[in-house]
Regions:
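Bacterial Sec-dependent N-terminal signal peptides
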Residues: 1-28, 210-216
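Short glycine/proline- and aromatic-enriched beta-strand/turn motifs that initiate or cap beta-hairpins
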Residues: 20-57, 213-215
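Residues that define the transmembrane beta-barrel architecture of outer-membrane proteins
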Residues: 21-23, 45-51, 103-107, 155-161, ...
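Gram-negative (and chloroplast) outer-membrane scaffold detector with strong preference
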Residues: 23, 31, 58-142, 169-173, ...
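Outer-membrane beta-barrel translocator domains and adjoining extracellular loop/strand segments
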Residues: 37-43, 79-86, 137-146, 190-196
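Outer-membrane beta-barrel domain signature
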Residues: 40-44, 98-102, 150-155, 195-199
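Predominantly the C-terminal beta-signal and adjacent terminal strand-loop region
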Residues: 70, 76-82, 152-216
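Short structured motifs
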Residues: 112, 148-150, 164
């Protein structure tokens, strides 16, 4: 494995040196607004706001056309603010708020094409695909001191479509900031168990991302 790693570095390093003017690297962070869909119960969950952090690389094919890839760590949440009926110690039904939250931690790899436009090519749209790998998931509830590990209830792989819109703020010849709104639309059923009413569980994540890009 180490030999393969060094072979890849040996091959790629000269290419990076030759094409360094066409390649931008970056670090990014932001917020995601995540929700689930595919069945009535999942769609009743309230979307959750959480965070993402990652790194990026962008290769320019032309001045206004490029291919980008990110590797992001994404924390996704969905909340159940419904009511649960329980039987108390005297045998009477009582209603409490569930206040539970599903938490998913993913590594997400989006690959997409950017098209720049405007007088200074400072606006852009993009589209492509993403691949997600589930690190872990859990169910957290205010009514319990312990979280429930739900990792085994979900498939490890998620994948879907990516599309977004953004603005470039040029800092100098080698550095810029990009502010982007991006949609990750999951297309796979992520549940590893049968879903209520023969449904599915699919992810949806709307991202607000700030990316610092630089040339080496």
């Amino acid at each position: 494995m180490k030999k393969l790693f060094f072979v890849i570095i040996f091959i790629c390093f000269p290419l990076i040196l030759v094409a360094q003017d066409k390649i931008k690297f970056g670090v990014n962070g932001g917020l995601n607004y995540a929700s689930l869909r595919g069945n009535d119960l999942a769609e009743d969950l309230a979307p959750g706001i959480s965070y993402l952090v990652g790194v990026s690389a962008e290769f320019f094919l032309k001045e206004n056309l490029s291919i980008s890839a990110n590797l992001n760590y994404e924390n996704k949440t969905a909340k159940d603010n419904g009511n649960v009926y329980l039987i108390d110690e005297y045998g009477f039904p009582t209603m409490i708020k569930s206040d539970s939250k599903s938490i998913y931690n993913y590594l997400v790899l989006p690959v997409y094409v950017n098209y720049y436009f405007g007088k200074k090519d400072d606006f852009y749209v993009n589209g492509g695909l993403f691949l997600g790998y589930l690190l872990n998931s859990k169910l957290s509830s205010k009514n319990s001191d312990n979280d429930t590990d739900t990792t085994d209830m979900n498939k490890k792989i998620d994948a879907g479509l990516v599309f977004g819109f953004g603005k470039v703020f040029q800092l100098n010849d080698k550095n810029n900031l990009k502010l982007e709104i991006r949609e990750n639309l999951g297309m796979l059923n992520t549940s590893d168990f049968d879903v209520y009413n023969d449904g599915t569980i699919k992810t949806n994540s709307l991202n607000l991302i700030l990316n610092w890009n630089f040339n080496l």
